[in-house]
């Protein structure tokens, strides 16, 4: 998914129909901050592909929406999107974690 597709989805969730150059530049900055938080790669332009992982792109989209709610001052929506982002972030970052049972060996008994 490209940065532009993520931006469009975030704006659609907030009901914002127009985008401009200042908004695009802010979106690149926000996407890179969120992607870094999720251990992803950065983009230089909105036309760059961020990831092909659907869960990762959804988490970035929710995070971008969360950041835009701060910008427009919508605290009720910000609470919702912050909670949603934190849940998606936790799921995404814990996806590779496994817990193994190990018994002590040798002299460590």
Which residues are covered by each model-predicted region?
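Short, well-ordered coil↔helix boundary/capping segments
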Residues: 51-59, 75
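Conserved short "hinge" loops at termini or chain/domain junctions
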Residues: 1-52, 83, 87-109
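Charged, low-complexity interaction regions
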Residues: 18, 71-77
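Short, hydrophobic/amphipathic alpha-helical patches that form generic packing surfaces
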Residues: 58-72
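Catalytic-loop motifs flanking and including active-site residues across diverse enzymes
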Residues: 3-6, 57-61
């Amino acid at each position: 998914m490209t940065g532009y597709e993520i931006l469009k989805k975030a704006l659609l969730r907030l009901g914002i129909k127009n985008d401009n150059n200042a908004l695009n530049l802010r979106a690149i900055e926000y996407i890179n901050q969120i992607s870094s938080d999720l251990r992803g790669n950065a983009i230089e332009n909105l036309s760059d592909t961020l990831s092909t992982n659907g869960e990762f792109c959804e988490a970035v989209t929710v995070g971008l929406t969360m950041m835009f709610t701060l910008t427009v001052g919508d605290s009720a929506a910000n609470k919702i999107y912050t909670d949603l982002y934190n849940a998606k972030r936790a799921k995404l970052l814990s996806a590779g974690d496994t817990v193994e049972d190990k018994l002590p060996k040798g002299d460590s008994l």
